[in-house]
Amino acid sequence: MQRPAFAIAALVLAVGIGSARAADEVVIGALYPMTGPNAQVGADAKAAMETAADIINGNHNVPMLLGKGGGLDKLGGAKIRLIFADHQGDPQKARAEAERLITQEHVVALIGSYQSATAATISQVADRYEVPYMSADNSSPSLNQRGLKWFFRTSPHDVMFTQAMFDFFRDIGAKTGHKVSSVVLFHEDTIFGTDSSNAQKQMADAAGIKVAADIRYRGNSPSLSAEVQQIKAADADVIMPSSYTSDAILLMRGLHDVGYTPKAIMAQSAGFVEQAFIDAVGPLAEGVMSRSAFALDASKARPAIPAVDALYKARNNKDLNDNTGREITALVVLADAINRAGSLDEDKIRQALVATDIPGNQTIMPWKGVKFDATGQNTEASPVIQQIKGGVYHTIYPFDVAAEPAVWNVGK
């Protein structure tokens, strides 16, 4: 790995005080919001990462990639050790923590980080130090379009997710006779919301669907009352929010407070798939739809799901969701590449990531598989659409993998 001169100096100093990596372990840095408004997301991500590491290191014999346990066999049974860092949802804090993990903790790779805005800075640091960054759950499509060599993303991005939404609108309209004619876009003001809205506008235009309102708001706002009034006035067929947890809760409560019941809500995941959201708004969440990369109800096609969910639930007292399913998968894929590299050399790990070709049935995800293109994007990740029924998300699309029929009130 060709590190900058100042980084080499930092490493020499760190090694001099005895913090070199042990040969019997593989140290990976995980960056998440452990404090602040999305602290619960960070806590859940930590539990997911620890579950994945336990599957790899332990003896659970789960029917999935690296599920036999015992550590990484091509590294003599070396165990995965995770070092967690709190970026607090702040891109600059994320930058500093990524650099600390590389220069002081000597991690061989980074993984994270929930908010796409933090991934933008983390991945820049990773590229500068030539250390792989595995994007577990960042969905902004611009992240893999910056010419970075060390960026890899297992999950679909928001263009892929949005395409699934508009495919659903087309197919549910044809199936029921109740077509979507208008949408309201509602999005927070960071790279996540902006990129999501841009993709949705383009696809709405292509589908001949009117964008009745395009509402941009400041993330973690204390109030969304003005924005809720705009949504009510637009009265579109579908509200399409791109919001983190606290904003998702405010939105649903605000709509209820003004007496407005949307015909349909199609969320860009994020806060809408968190148990904290469902718990906070209760029956107001019923019928909410979201794109997802993970389907808990797909255990027939993915037999590892029940075992992995049980291990995660024992640790965190809740089932896997879209975010935690992606986080587990990303760490397993990263660990598999390190194992295939047979080395802690970052360049060899990168080469192994480039060569990744994992069938979907070796994962817990409803994907064709994992294979990265030249930009580091997994091209074989296929989203699903889910809907909350009885406080639980159920897969409703594609129709051939649906566990439940969609409740569709548009046009009624």
Predicted regions and their residues:
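Short, glycine/charge-rich beta-strand/loop segments that flank catalytic centers
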Residues: A14
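Extracytosolic ligand-binding ectodomains
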Residues: Q2-L11, A22-K412
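N-terminal signal peptide c-region/cleavage motif recognized by signal peptidases
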Residues: I17-S19
